[in-house]
Each structure stands twice: as structure tokens, then as C-alpha cells.
Amino acid sequence: VVQNNVDDFETVADIFVGTGVVADLFRKQGKKIIVNDILYSNFVNFNTWFGNEKIDYDKIVSIINELNTTAPTSENYVSLNFGNKYFSYENAKKIGAIREKIEHYDVNEREKSFLLTSLLYAMDKVANTVGHYDAYRKKMDTLKPIHLRVPENNKNFQNEIYK
């Protein structure tokens, strides 16, 4: 639609960006993108994918590898409130421990977004839900251990992200 109706443009504003798929399509074409979403977790994800701040990608890979080996030793907020509901107890315990560890790394804002995005997407893979977080299954049948993956590092220039 855009290619058929707009001649030459350099900037695209996606003000209700949601998953970011449309904005990413234009980012891949070398356009400057402006994104907005009121949901804070989306802001974190967009900072990962569309942010301009330089990151040390090797450091991110190393930290995520370390986070995957986290062996929680005590209960935490996530295990107490979400264990055996939205997540298996062990996954909830590990999620909470990882989330706490992320706060202690010496990283810039975008690097922290990479770590949080990795955790958010890993949580989604092991969640005991049926489409959204208001509807979880009473029987815990999602027992796969949580595993964080390293988000792709996109080269971005002059993008703007709002919440």
C-alpha cells in the first residue's frame, strides 16, 4: 500500500506499534522509524530492536550464557506469586533469580533492554497460559526448562522510541 501511494519518504511513524513487525519492515529498508507504545515491556523490546545506543554484543552474549546457568537457591517474588500457576515452580524461581541478577550488571540502557527482552521472550515460551496471561491452565503441563536466547542486534540510526 505504501509503495503504491507514497513516492519518496525517509521516516515512518508507527504510533500503535504493538509487536513491531510493521516498523521492522521499514527499518530493514533503511528508513528512520518512530515508534510508540504505552506498554513498558514493548518499550523495552523496541529499545532492543530499534534503539540507537551502541552495545557490546559479545558482552550481551556472555551475560545471557551466564544467566542460562543460573541456579536459584531461594524463593523470590516470581516463584512465590507465579510458581505452579503461570510457570512451573522451578522456572518461576529461575525467572525471579535472573530478573534480580539483571539489575546488578554494569550495562547501558540498551544492553539492559537486550537482557530483559531475552528474558521476556523466554518466559513466553514456558508460560502455562492459553493465549494471554489472564487464562492459565490449572494443570501444570509446561515443564520445559526456561532458556534465554540472544536477540538479534540491528544496526539503527536516528530512530525514536516513545512510551
Feature roles, as predicted:
Residues 1-8:
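Conserved alpha-helix/loop element of class I SAM-dependent methyltransferases that forms part
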Residues 8-18:
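Conserved class I S-adenosyl-L-methionine
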Residues 22-23:
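Conserved SAM-dependent methyltransferase scaffold
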Residues 26:
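Aromatic pocket-lining residues of Rossmann-like dinucleotide-binding sites
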Residues 32, 38-162:
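Class I S-adenosyl-L-methionine-dependent methyltransferase module
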